[in-house]
């Protein structure tokens, strides 16, 4: 039995015949041709074997229509959004010399050149005439929803929702893409070819668009402005992402939490939060990440690379958001203002954590003991008590830390370094947080006020401990005697009554104490002036 070719089952019309058909007849024709193509594809016919171009070249028939109908139509045949082009076929031939027009076999449309025809066939059949042979054929499992799109790129991106597949596999890393252009662009990332180099920081890029966006991080240029609120951005992607805040809508929506996204890549990265997938692994330490940008930022902790430098003080940073946040120290900008107490913050994350001091929200819970926390750093710090491990470990005393900044501060307790000096009294501190709390002793600032009794406090821990007086809460319970305490510091002091631990030793006389306050009181007895309080009564 001879094999069936497309020419054997094709039904064609002249331009005049096509014009006489009513919409329902045209729709019927399209449906029949669509089904024919799919049937041929399902039995393994390769489009390049059909010589479609030659078939139409020698027919001598007129093209069906002098206008290009929009490619993506609704199933009932109605057009959404108008027509692709108003040019007649002969005008297209004149405008593009050397390009022969090939007739489309599906919708009676005109495609410019064989490559356009191939793309057109692929859009309707799900089969790639040329490139499929190289990358391997994949079955078409689409259920068409007939949603219209203004661009081929948008259509192909949408199509993935139905198929769940992409057409091109990278042989290096296995990543898949839905267009040849995108896989070619991706392959460059493996070659290491980066011809566009930044004159300011030396960073190199594979594409001019990425290079131009990066340059704006140095110049501060933000050409893309939100029409709703006027906020400006360095690239079009950022403004689209921002617009979701106003519209509350995006083409991709998370099925788990309902969060909308403007791009497929952002959506896929977000999904990994729920699945726990972390495909990007650090070669240095083995730590895994959900997306490649996070991995690149992490790698800088190993390389020490800090490409972003402050023009005011010269301090360098590993990534751009840290620089932008630091710059606000110089400008004094604090764009995030608390509606409850009026306190302002430099960063959105610090502001969100602060808001929880008013709401009492503690969304992060320890899986080991059930204790809840208002922020992730607090929970991670707590988790070390259970695991006894952390990515950063002190070489002097072996204490583990969950993040780099507390580790750096701790190191100063051994080196004696105190880089933060009070302008009022000259007292020095190991961290910026400590000096801010200390400065309140000079300014009298007490930002934390109790709603029950109106008493105000200089810093959060004192305020939290005070609140427990009203609630009666005593979360720290001694396992030995059952006595409960409001604060962890009081609890630790109590534990020493059972263990006998006395960590504070007097160098003068060798006497030891269980708490710092008792030790400091004792040290006054060795002072040159003697104890500050002396009994004036003479013994009888």
Swiss-Prot record:
KRAB domain ranges (all copies): 4-90
Record PANTHER family: ZINC FINGER PROTEIN (PTHR24376), ZINC FINGER PROTEIN 544-RELATED (PTHR24376:SF189)
Residues annotated with Phosphoserine modification: 191
Main location group: nucleus
Keyword Ribosomal protein annotated: no
Keywords: DNA-binding, Metal-binding, Nucleus, Phosphoprotein, Repeat, Repressor, Transcription, Transcription regulation, Zinc, Zinc-finger
Cell compartment(s), UniProt: Nucleus
General function of this protein: May be involved in transcriptional regulation as a weak repressor when alone, or a potent one when fused with a heterologous protein containing a KRAB B-domain.
An example Gene Ontology CC term for this record: nucleus
The protein, known as: Zinc finger protein 136
Alphabetical GO biological process terms: negative regulation of transcription by RNA polymerase II; regulation of transcription by RNA polymerase II
Pfam families listed in its UniProt record: KRAB (PF01352), zf-C2H2 (PF00096), zf-C2H2_4 (PF13894), zf-C2H2_6 (PF13912)
Cited InterPro entries: KRAB, KRAB_dom_sf, Znf_C2H2_sf, Znf_C2H2_type
One of the record's GO molecular function terms: zinc ion binding
Similarity section: Belongs to the krueppel C2H2-type zinc-finger protein family.
Tissue expression profile of the protein: Seems ubiquitous. Seen in the heart, brain, placenta, lung, liver, skeletal muscle, kidney and pancreas.
ZnF C2H2-type span: 140-162, 168-190, 196-218, 224-246, 252-274, 280-302, 308-330, 336-358, 364-386, 392-414, 420-442, 448-470, 476-498, 504-526
Family matches, as CDD domains: KRAB_A-box
């Amino acid at each position: 039995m001879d094999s069936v070719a497309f020419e054997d089952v094709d039904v064609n019309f002249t331009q005049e015949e096509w014009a006489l058909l009513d919409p329902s007849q045209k729709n019927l024709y399209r449906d029949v041709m669509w089904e024919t193509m799919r049937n041929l594809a399902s039995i393994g016919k390769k489009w390049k074997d059909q010589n479609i171009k030659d078939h139409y070249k020698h027919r001598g028939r007129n093209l069906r229509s002098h206008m290009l109908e929009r490619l993506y139509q609704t199933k009932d045949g109605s057009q959404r959004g108008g027509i692709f082009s108003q040019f007649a076929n002969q005008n297209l031939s004149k405008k593009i010399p050397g390009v022969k027009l090939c007739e489309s076999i599906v919708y009676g449309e005109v495609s410019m050149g064989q490559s356009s025809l191939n793309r057109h066939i692929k859009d309707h059949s799900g089969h790639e005439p040329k490139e499929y042979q190289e990358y391997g054929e994949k079955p078409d499992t689409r259920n068409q929803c007939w949603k219209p799109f203004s661009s081929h790129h948008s259509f192909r991106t949408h199509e993935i929702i139905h198929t769940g597949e992409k057409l091109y596999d990278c042989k290096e890393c296995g990543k898949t893409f839905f267009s040849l252009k995108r896989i070619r662009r991706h392959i460059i990332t493996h070659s290491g070819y980066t011809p566009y180099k930044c004159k300011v920081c030396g960073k190199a890029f594979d594409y001019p668009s990425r290079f131009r966006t990066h340059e704006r991080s140095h110049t501060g240029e933000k050409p893309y402005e939100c029409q709703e609120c006027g906020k400006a951005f360095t690239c079009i992607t950022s403004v689209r992402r921002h617009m979701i805040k106003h519209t509350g809508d995006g083409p991709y929506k998370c099925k788990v939490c309902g969060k909308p996204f403007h791009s497929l890549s952002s959506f896929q990265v977000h999904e990994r939060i729920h699945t726990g997938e972390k495909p990007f692994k650090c070669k240095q330490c083995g730590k895994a990440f959900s997306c490649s940008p996070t991995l690149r930022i992490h790698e800088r902790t190993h390389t020490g690379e800090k490409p972003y430098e402050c023009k005011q003080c010269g301090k360098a940073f590993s990534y751009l958001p840290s620089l932008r946040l630091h710059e606000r120290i110089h400008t004094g900008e604090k764009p995030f203002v608390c509606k409850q107490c009026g306190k302002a913050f430099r960063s959105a994350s610090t502001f969100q954590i602060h808001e929880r001091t008013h709401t009492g929200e503690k969304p992060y819970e320890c899986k080991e003991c059930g204790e809840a926390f208002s922020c992730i750093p607090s929970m991670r710090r707590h988790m070390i008590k259970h695991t006894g491990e952390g990515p950063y470990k002190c070489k002097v005393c072996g204490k583990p830390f969950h993040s780099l900044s507390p580790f750096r501060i701790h190191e100063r307790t051994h080196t004696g370094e105190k880089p933060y000096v009070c302008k009022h009294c000259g007292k020095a501190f190991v961290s910026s947080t400590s000096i801010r709390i200390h400065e309140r002793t000079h300014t009298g600032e007490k930002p934390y006020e109790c709603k029950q009794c109106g008493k105000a406090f200089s810093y959060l821990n004192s305020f939290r401990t005070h609140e427990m007086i009203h609630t009666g809460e005593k979360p720290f319970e001694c396992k030995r005697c059952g006595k409960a305490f409001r604060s962890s510091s009081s609890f630790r002091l109590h534990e020493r009554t059972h263990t006998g631990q006395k960590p504070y030793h007097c160098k003068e006389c060798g006497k030891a104490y269980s708490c710092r306050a008792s030790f400091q009181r004792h040290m006054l007895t060795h002072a040159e002036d003697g104890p500050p309080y002396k009994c004036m009564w003479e013994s009888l």
